[in-house]
């Protein structure tokens, strides 16, 4: 290696975005983006870490217009159940409807409602709808030995599969009902529309939804676990290969097999160089690249091994490869993004979306319980290469196959931050402000208009708050 061939692997604190002439107000900035066929209203994905993303985080992210990626440090059954929970959280037309027959007992109907947390059951004979029974019906049926046919509402109001949310709302209001069975022309039950789902759809107009109106969700997988990928396939919208170093022949070959055999869109990662991006996008039919190695706040890969690819450098390298080959592959910046300033720099360098771990850890929706220390509330946040995460064994191969006997992550505490909606709203507001300063109306313009400058250590110190003691530190 000759010293004159050294590359400058710059990171977020090495550069600054310069302000430009603008007519753009932050409130008018459009942050929509696409990852394959998945349209996002906000360009944010939650990281597949077991202290960041399970079903609660995924539901919240999708409702805000982002996307949650479920971690894989669990059994495949647990991961599937998380994905199912996201899909069930909202669905304009519920397809997998739980039903009863007229000859079932009221007690059986009551048990099903209690077990599944639902308030009504269509009544069918064969596949034909003959009635509907509600929680109110079973509540007032004092004799549990009565049959469903004795208390059900016969000939309920029904709609066809072409019904729209607006039409459903009007019908429910007119007839003062909360459930609308969806039937075919021959009267066979197709699905169910509930008032709750109509409400959620109207309350979250920018949510990330699939063709059936359900919330979208992704799941992390090992490229070597094709059985898990196949099991998850019916319940997720995208699979994300979850390895620290994707630019490995065994990993690439295993990922190609998943793409060929599973039939679900794939985001590949993590990568850190132009060459890795080039090989991934020319050899694999992927929709996105997860970019950055060793930059996460709880990742110690660079420290332990001396090998890393800082996220901003990696984004610039990967986006150059995507441009060269004119591929419709999204570049997703992953690691070291603590706030909207880092995200803005990533978009300027060519990112299409950002993946957040630390920025979302500690929120109410992040997995884990809160703890009180010194009068303040905290939550656990750990890297997937930390000893405690590796002890669960499901994600051990993220850092090699077979697993290396070294830890490449740490575990720590982060302050409890409350609802993730509030955290993301602030993040998005800061991001829009950055776009406004640059003069970019959208992500595409941010890539083309942003002027990036190197900044000295003194310059970085100057633009940070200085020469005063923050009030919160005095109160500490």
From Swiss-Prot:
Its EC number is 1.1.1.205. K(+) binds at residues 294, 296, 299, 462. The active site is at residues 299, 398. Mycophenolic acid (MPA) is a non-competitive inhibitor that prevents formation of the closed enzyme conformation by binding to the same site as the amobile flap. In contrast, mizoribine monophosphate (MZP) is a competitive inhibitor that induces the closed conformation. MPA is a potent inhibitor of mammalian IMPDHs but a poor inhibitor of the bacterial enzymes. MZP is a more potent inhibitor of bacterial IMPDH. Pathway: Purine metabolism; XMP biosynthesis via de novo pathway; XMP from IMP: step 1/1. The keyword Transit peptide does not apply. SMART domains: CBS, IMPDH. Residues 93-151, 152-211 form the CBS domain. GO terms for molecular function: IMP dehydrogenase activity; metal ion binding. InterPro entries: Aldolase_TIM, CBS_dom, CBS_dom_sf, IMP_DH, IMP_DH/GMP_Rdtase_CS, IMP_DH_GMPRt. IMP binds at residues 297, 334-336, 357-358, 381-385, 408. Coiled coil: none annotated. Its cofactor is K(+). The keyword Cell division does not apply. NAD(+) binds at residues 242, 292-294. Pfam families: CBS, IMPDH. NCBIfam families: IMP_dehydrog. PANTHER family: INOSINE-5'-MONOPHOSPHATE DEHYDROGENASE (PTHR11911:SF111), INOSINE-5-MONOPHOSPHATE DEHYDROGENASE RELATED (PTHR11911). Belongs to the IMPDH/GMPR family. Homotetramer. This is Inosine-5'-monophosphate dehydrogenase. The gene is guaB.
């Amino acid at each position: 290696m000759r010293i004159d061939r050294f590359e400058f692997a710059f990171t977020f604190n090495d550069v600054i975005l310069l302000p430009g002439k603008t007519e753009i107000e932050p409130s008018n900035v459009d942050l929509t983006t696409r990852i394959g066929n998945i349209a996002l209203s906000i360009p944010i994905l939650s990281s597949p870490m077991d202290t960041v993303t399970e079903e609660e985080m995924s539901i919240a992210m999708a409702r805000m217009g982002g996307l949650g990626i479920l971690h894989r440090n669990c059994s495949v059954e647990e991961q599937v159940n998380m994905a199912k929970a996201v899909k069930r959280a909202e669905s304009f037309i519920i397809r997998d409807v739980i039903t009863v027959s007229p000859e079932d007992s009221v007690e059986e109907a009551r048990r099903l409602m209690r077990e599944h947390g639902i308030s009504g059951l269509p009544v069918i004979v064969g596949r034909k709808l003959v009635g509907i029974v509600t929680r109110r019906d079973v509540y007032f049926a004092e004799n549990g030995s009565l049959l469903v046919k004795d208390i059900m509402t016969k000939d309920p109001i029904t709609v066809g599969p072409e019904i729209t949310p607006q039409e459903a709302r009007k019908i429910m209001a007119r007839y003062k009902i909360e459930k609308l069975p969806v039937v075919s022309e021959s009267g066979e039950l197709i699905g169910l529309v509930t008032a709750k789902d109509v409400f959620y759809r109207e309350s979250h107009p920018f949510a990330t939804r699939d063709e059936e109106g359900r919330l979208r969700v992704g799941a992390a997988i090992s490229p070597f676990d094709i059985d898990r990928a196949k099991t998850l396939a019916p319940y997720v919208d995208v699979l994300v290969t979850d390895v620290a170093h994707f630019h490995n022949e065994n990993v690439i070959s295993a990922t190609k097999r998943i793409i060929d055999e599973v039939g679900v869109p794939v985001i590949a990662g993590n990568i850190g160089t132009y060459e890795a991006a080039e090989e991934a996008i020319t050899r694999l039919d992927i929709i996105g690249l997860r970019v950055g190695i060793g930059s996460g706040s709880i990742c110690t890969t660079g420290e332990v091994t001396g090998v890393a690819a800082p996220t901003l450098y990696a984004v610039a390298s990967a986006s150059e490869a995507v441009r060269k080959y004119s591929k419709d592959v999204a570049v997703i910046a992953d690691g070291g993004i603590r706030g909207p300033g880092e995200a803005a720099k990533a978009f300027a360098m060519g990112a299409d979306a950002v993946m957040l771990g630390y920025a979302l850890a500690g929120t109410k929706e992040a997995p884990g319980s809160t703890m009180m220390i010194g009068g303040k509330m905290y939550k656990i946040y750990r890297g997937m290469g930390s000893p405690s995460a590796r002890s669960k064994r499901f994600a051990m191969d993220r850092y090699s196959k077979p697993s290396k006997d070294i830890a490449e992550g740490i575990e720590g505490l982060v302050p409890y931050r409350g609802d993730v909606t509030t955290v993301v709203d602030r993040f998005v507001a800061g991001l829009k402000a950055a776009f406004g300063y640059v003069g970019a109306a959208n992500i595409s313009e941010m890539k083309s208009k942003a002027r990036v400058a190197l900044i000295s250590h003194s310059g970085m110190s100057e633009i940070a708050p200085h020469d005063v003691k923050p009030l919160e530190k005095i109160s500490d």
